[in-house]
Amino acid sequence: MSLLSVVFVALALSADCFAVSIGIACTHTDVKPRIMWRVAGTFGLFQAGMAVIGYYAGLSIADVISSFDHWVAFGLLTVIGGRMVYESVQGEDDQKLVRLDLTRGLGLLGVAIATSIDALAVGLTFSLSETNIGLAALLVGAVSLAVSYLGFKLGNRISHLASRWVGIAGGLILCLIGLKILAEHTLGWDILL
């Protein structure tokens, strides 16, 4: 695969990270750069790591993984997003709105796994096309990190809207990404974002 093709693949893989970063920034007031870099770095590491795992896994397990990866991503994103919507609707003030912290711990781990599952499949295609996995993983990780950080910057700019509605929107974004992944894998739809 050419270097330009790998860059385009990296941009496509980072779309979910971008949307999730916007959602997280919208549900947390004034996300600090340290947190942005931690989450963006985690997304970049998971994207690169999953691509490497997919590359080395090879075709022997491709059918097994592809039979359930979309369900895992859908389930994680829908549960996390649904909980964010529920907490935003139930919350009475800004202090109670964000109980599920997606910037660290299990919350961050869940969204990092869910947004990087597609990179596993892409890693398989890298092995088939004799792509340099070191360079490809570096590009996928770096692009995901940069795009995630930009998502945080954009999310911070719009997070000053009514926080209850922004929390609902952030949760719905996660749910929609889960539905997108499910539709792409089960219905064969090619959805851009």
Curated annotation (Swiss-Prot):
Keywords: Cell membrane, Ion transport, Manganese, Membrane, Transmembrane, Transmembrane helix, Transport
GO molecular function: manganese ion transmembrane transporter activity
Gene Ontology CC annotations of this record: plasma membrane
Membrane-spanning ranges: 6-26, 39-59, 61-81, 106-126, 132-152, 165-185
Keyword Transport: yes
Record carries keyword rRNA-binding: no
Family classification: Belongs to the MntP (TC 9.B.29) family.
Listed HAMAP family: MntP_pump
Protein name: Putative manganese efflux pump MntP
Organism per entry: Dehalococcoides mccartyi (strain ATCC BAA-2266 / KCTC 15142 / 195)
Annotated gene: mntP
